[in-house]
C-alpha cells in the first residue's frame, strides 16, 4: 500500500486530452512502483486497471495487473474465500458492465461468478455485456458539465437496469457506482434499490 506516494493513474487527464498531465502522473507512478520492485498490482477501478495494464508498459511500467472482480473470482474458485451468511440469497441482482472492464478488457464473467456465489438471482437486462450502455462517466465525462439534451446518460442507464426490478444494482467500478447511485436517487428509488460494488456484496454477506 503506497498511501501518499500513490498518484492518480492519469486516466482522466488523458481522456480529457491533457497528455502532459497523464505523462507526468504515469511516470511518477512508474518510478515509485519500480523503485519498490512491484510486480503485481490489484486495482478496484477498471479505469486504473486498463491504464496500468495496457498503457503503462509503453512507459516502462510492466506489471501483472488484476481487477478485484477477477481476484475475488479466483479466491472463491480456489476455496480461499468462503461466501457464507446468505444475506443476498434469492435477492434479485442485476449487474452493470463497466466499459473498461468489459469492452476494453473482455472481463464479463468474473463479476457475475462472484454474484452467483451469493446464491442470488442474477437477472440480466437486454443491454448488457458488450451491448451495455456506459454509465456516463467514461472518457472523462464525469468531470464535464451537462450537455444539451433530454436526459442524462446515467439516468437512461439506471432506467434500463430498473426494468428487471432489481433489489440491487451491482457494479465493479467506483465511477459506475457514483453515476448509478445518482441515477437511482433521481428516480426516487434509493429506499428500494441499492447500488453496491461486488466487494461490498461479499463483505456484507459475510458479516463485515
Model segments located where?
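Iron-sulfur cluster-binding electron-transfer modules in prokaryotic oxidoreductases
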Residues: 1-208
Amino acid at each position: 500500500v503506497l498511501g501518499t506516494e500513490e498518484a492518480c493513474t492519469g486516466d482522466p487527464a488523458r481522456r480529457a486530452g491533457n497528455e502532459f498531465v497523464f505523462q507526468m502522473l504515469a511516470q511518477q507512478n512508474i518510478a515509485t512502483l519500480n523503485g519498490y520492485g512491484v510486480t503485481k498490482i490489484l486495482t478496484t477501478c477498471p479505469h486504473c486497471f486498463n491504464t496500468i495494464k495496457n498503457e503503462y508498459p509503453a512507459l516502462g511500467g510492466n506489471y501483472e495487473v488484476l481487477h478485484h472482480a477477477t481476484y475475488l473470482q479466483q479466491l472463491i474458485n480456489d476455496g480461499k474465500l468462503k461466501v457464507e451468511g446468505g444475506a443476498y440469497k434469492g435477492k434479485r441482482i442485476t449487474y452493470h458492465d463497466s466499459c473498461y472492464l468489459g469492452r476494453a478488457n473482455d472481463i464479463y464473467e468474473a463479476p457475475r461468478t462472484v454474484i452467483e456465489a451469493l446464491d442470488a438471482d442474477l437477472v440480466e437486462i437486454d443491454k448488457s455485456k458488450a451491448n451495455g450502455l456506459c454509465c456516463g462517466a467514461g472518457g472523462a465525462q464525469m468531470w464535464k458539465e451537462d450537455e444539451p439534451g433530454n436526459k442524462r446518460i446515467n439516468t437512461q442507464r439506471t432506467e434500463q437496469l430498473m426494468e428487471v426490478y432489481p433489489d440491487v444494482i451491482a457494479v465493479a467500478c467506483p465511477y459506475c457506482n457514483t453515476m448509478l447511485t445518482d441515477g437511482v436517487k433521481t428516480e426516487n428509488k434509493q429506499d428500494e434499490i441499492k447500488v453496491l460494488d461486488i466487494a461490498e456484496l461479499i463483505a456484507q454477506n459475510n458479516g463485515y
